Amino acid sequence: MFCKANSNMEICHSFAALKTNKYTHVENCSSSVSKFILLGFPYTWEIQILCFSVFSGTYILTLIGNLCIICAVRCDHQLQTPMYILLANFPFLEIWFVTSTVPNMLANFLSETNTISFSGCFLQFYFFFSMGTTETFFLSAMAFDRCLAICRPLHYPTVMPVQRCIRMGAPCWACGFLYFLLPIYLISQLPFCCLNKIDHFLCDPGPLIKLSCVPAPVTEIICAIYNSVLIFSTLFFITSSYALVIRAVLRVPSAEGQQKAFSTCGSHLSVVSLFYGSIMVVYVSPTAGDPAGIQKYVTLFYSVLTPPFNPLIYSLRNKEMKEALRKLFKTVRFRQRPGRNP
């Protein structure tokens, strides 16, 4: 009996020591993870160079196209309306949205290490999600503006003056940058146990949570709730607004009036469809739990490949915007003409 008790005591002490060593190892590894490795797209060197060239071109086109939209709205006094003031926020947002990820991705195409610091990873995570969240709020604000303009055209100048439109944009920026603070903080506090390889080209919550050496069901549930509430609430608001717009447009007697209203809203709906279709596949569909699967390429699609086309969508289907861009290019060419009189 004495020997059996001693044996049990030894087993208990051994288990306690093993448990203590395990958590000590977790703590040490957690403190030693100072950087992450972004696996990105593990192609051959030739394909990496090709990807660098293609994505550099799309990034430059995104910057140029969105800057042209901003300058056109800024310089043309006819575009100083609530609709175009909200529209000018959108390309400014797009510039910073792609800048939060693309430069680092381009550097990794030419790098052999593909590393990003711990703080740099979570800063990228914060700005990427904050810009994306702000974009959903601005898309909702633009839908609300179009709903008022088309459904209540006589009251629109009183209900939505320029100053009120500017004040409406400020909460979109503030809420966008505050919304994901809690999930980002919770993920940053997870122990990573020396596991630092992220199977993605950016710091995304799904791959980061999977690196944790302890289960984090509460953090996963909170992230899922935040994503679902944001996506479905703003999408419901946008679709409801455009349902009212479509009902009002169908009551317009003239075909010309219907065409003008649909052309104004068509560009916005195109951007909404591309953006929400992509983020729903990544964050609320069954593939959202597979970081190595389709979501990495869908993220590439909506964060890198579609932004260059948004300025084209807004300008080609909008007569006022095309005219403002034509005036802007004409002014630039006139100023660059040699021998021009001051």
Go through each PLM region and give its residues.
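Charged structural interfaces that engage phosphate-rich ligands
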Residues: M1-N21
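Transmembrane helical core of 7TM receptor-like proteins
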Residues: T20-P342
